[in-house]
Amino acid sequence: VEGYADPHTWHDPVFWTETVIAVAQSMSQDLDLMVSADRIATLRTAARLIDEWITQTFAPIPVEQRIVVSAHDAFSYYGKRYGVSLEPLLGLSTASETKLARVNELVDLIAERDISAVFSETSVESAGIAALREGAAQRGVDLRSMPPLYSDALGPADKRGGQYFGMLIENTINIVDAISGERPSLSPSAQIFLEAHGLLATETLL
């Protein structure tokens, strides 16, 4: 909503984890509950491992190539932390209307910067993204079909994207694939740690 702060802080794993810990500690004092120091340490380690992996994953990609076209402005915290330029079709609110001028602006960007993919999102209606695809096709650009990004909600509980750290992993894999054409693998140390502490589903990463 215009005039309100960006609420999408969960796309920065370190910032979000510290927020969750602070809220839990505050609530525990109000409700006279105990917050496990071991659990806090586990979450901080998990956030650090994911943060390091995402940073290392983007490291080989030149900054000028790190451009993501998405359905709405949900990934600014992610972009700021990892040096990714975000070009959303809509603003912070998914209720805003797609403007033809913005569609045309993004089509120009896609053609000029040789962007290979645009992202729909699991929680956003994708008509605007379809318009981008059509506009790009008219300019001779055949955009790749990519899985939608998780923006405002997690995925189904039985999928990797249904868990917080899994959501970050899947988004990163798909973003890097769209930019570089390569699908990175999660570091073994991060995967083992997350699975051992119930923070990541034990399924094969694509």
Cite the ranges covered by each PLM segment.
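Extracytoplasmic metal-acquisition and chelation regions
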Residues: 1-206
